[in-house]
Amino acid sequence: MKPPAACAGDVVDTVSPCSTVNHLRWDLSAQQIRALTTQLIEQTKCVYDRVGAQDFEDVSYESTLKALADVEVTYTVQRNILDFPQHVSPNKDIRAASTEADKKLSEFDVEMSMRQDVYQRVVWLQEKIPKDSLKPEAARYLERLIKLGRRNGLHLPQDTQEKIKNIKKRLSLLCIDFNKNLNEDTTFLPFTREELGGLPEDFLNSLEKTEDGKLKVTLKYPHYFPLLKKCHVPETRRLLEEAFNCRCKEENCAILKELVSLRAQKSNLLGFRTHADYVLEMNMAKTSQTVATFLDELARKLKPLGEQERAVILELKEAECAKRGLPFDGRIHAWDMRYYMNQVEETRYRVDQNLLKEYFPMQVVTRGLLAIYQELLGLTFTLEEGAAAWHEDVRLYSVRDAASGEEIGKFYLDLYPREGKYGHAACFGLQPGCLRQDGSRQLAIAAMVANFTKPTPDVPSLLQHDEVETYFHEFGHVMHQLCSQAEFAMFSGTHVERDFVEAPSQMLENWVWEKEPLMRMSQHYRTGGEAPEDLLEKLIKSRQANAGLFNLRQIVLAKVDQVLHTQTDVDPAEEYARLCQEILGVPATPGTNMPATFGHLAGGYDAQYYGYLWSEVYSMDMFHTRFKQEGVLSPKVGMDYRTSILRPGGSEDASTMLKQFLGRDPKQDAFLLSKGLQVEGCEPPAC
């Protein structure tokens, strides 16, 4: 049997004739997105057809494994050009076209992942080729393709494969719609200035007005979090918290129900007891029982701390009600949590958040953050003036290795909210750093997308300290994308085990709790003066404030996720309410449906939200074992970190990387101490 004729043209050249370095482009119209989506599918399918049509005796590394790896590189870049605009484009038509492109391409991804003809030739190659003839990463790639083939059911009967394929296609569409609904939500609540009592003037002045002069408060983060923390009018907080947790309630509730059911069906067809067990097979945790034990033990250890913190909050609430002449009901409501947790910081630790943010103007934080990352990781960043992007607010930086001067990547910063934009903070890998078809290395390119408070004509963007922490976290993901030197796109950047992926960026959050880094990224926005030492010392001491309640809430979210993916016929809203009461000791607001707003459930974290806590075990161990001992800003430790943790991407197991960096197997001690818990034989970490 002859292979089909060679595919016409090269995907990169025909779909996106850009520079030889940055293949990304952001000037496509909705019509072009639609046309190029069809073209990309046709050209990529041609490669799969050629691989799948080979006679078995013709199967080789070059014709099979390398062909699949090469097309993955070009396909990934072109796909991102077409489907990333749905998250960031200011043009609604382009967002819609990009969303449709994502749906088509997701369906195509399913089709290609279910190619039994290709799978059979990959299996044949593994049996035919001596394992030691492949480089370690190529051998890992071969093993991973076979593992993924089995996880797609390609070893099962044809009718079962068809069922799995149809379920996968439907799941892709549902996930896209779930998050699109949240991104496109434009709900706002109108309030008078009196109803927004307690909020600072700069916040109030930044709000748009309704026709009758009321102030518009949206459900986006830069409005939601400040109001929940600072507004002293309980009814205003209640209305906003209720609206926030009712976003897309009806449509996403229906989507979530179908998602959970289809995931369970697919996992059962593949021989797994639950969807969680199917997902976790590829993670460090391996089984749902391991995750359940981890969460239960942590909840048990944190419970006394949570009880103490709730008692403090009730005291504060009683005093507040007496002061403002409000009735005290003796209970903590969901809309009370952030307000009184903020009061704990301000009264018990004397941290004035409004004063603090005056020392964190965006420009100063960005300058300090970039300087710290450059020094720590041995890099040089250069702003590319006038670079093309998807919006005028976006900035593009070039990244070079400081020692060699070699360019290793670029990153975009898109930091302010816009209508229709992705509503959280995230890092998007756009161009994987890996080897291209000719053996040259492709530049890694990533985008950090966030929603920090916009500047006004009078006041620059001022960041809350937790926003500075978010900035450091997400930029940590950017560095993971750019410093990775994997050979295969499949292992580039953050393509590591999902319950390890947060560890590298979580570790870098520690810098916003250390005095020297804080001094370097703070300066008063009016006077230019340094942040007072006592203000920073109070902030650093407040790190463990509310640690019990904050982490118990993380456990609630992780358990909701696990329950939905280990049990059938569970009502998500009821389950969330039960766990809030049982673990957090604070009831969910009646009538709300938080899981319908929980983007992680449809954003690749299904059965894996526990990973935020799980990976913190490793992030805290890395920080306290190396950086805290040898120097928080030590370039030597930073380079060890870049080499051992960031450089491999997913080309090695996380456990191997950790052992190399730590010099031993990981331990939980630093993690537990960071939560304010006692560990036998260990001193608490110095603040």
From Swiss-Prot:
Gene Ontology process terms (BP): intracellular signal transduction; peptide catabolic process; peptide metabolic process; proteolysis
Tissue: Expressed abundantly in the testis. It is also found in the liver, lung and kidney.
Primary location class: cytoplasm
Listed PANTHER family: PROTEASE M3 THIMET OLIGOPEPTIDASE-RELATED (PTHR11804), THIMET OLIGOPEPTIDASE (PTHR11804:SF50)
Organism placement in taxonomy: Eukaryota, Metazoa, Chordata, Craniata, Vertebrata
Keywords: Acetylation, Cytoplasm, Hydrolase, Metal-binding, Metalloprotease, Phosphoprotein, Protease, Zinc
Annotated residues for binding of Zn(2+): H473, H477, H480
Subunit structure and binding partners: Monomer.
The species this protein was found in: Rattus norvegicus
Protein's cellular compartments: Cytoplasm
GO cellular component assignments: mitochondrial intermembrane space
Bilayer-spanning residue ranges: none
Required cofactor(s): Zn(2+)
Similarity comment: Belongs to the peptidase M3 family.
Phosphoserine, modified sites: S16, S172
Chemical reaction(s) catalysed: Preferential cleavage of bonds with hydrophobic residues at P1, P2 and P3' and a small residue at P1' in substrates of 5 to 15 residues
CDD domains: M3A_TOP
Catalytic residues as annotated in Swiss-Prot or TrEMBL: E474
A single GO molecular function term of this UniProt record: metalloendopeptidase activity
Modified sites of kind Phosphotyrosine: Y278
EC number from the UniProt entry: 3.4.24.15
Entry note: cofactor: Binds 1 zinc ion per subunit.
Function of the protein: Involved in the metabolism of neuropeptides under 20 amino acid residues long. Involved in cytoplasmic peptide degradation. Able to degrade the amyloid-beta precursor protein and generate amyloidogenic fragments. Also acts as a regulator of cannabinoid signaling pathway by mediating degradation of hemopressin, an antagonist peptide of the cannabinoid receptor CNR1.
Name of the protein: Thimet oligopeptidase
Residues that bear N6-acetyllysine: K257, K538
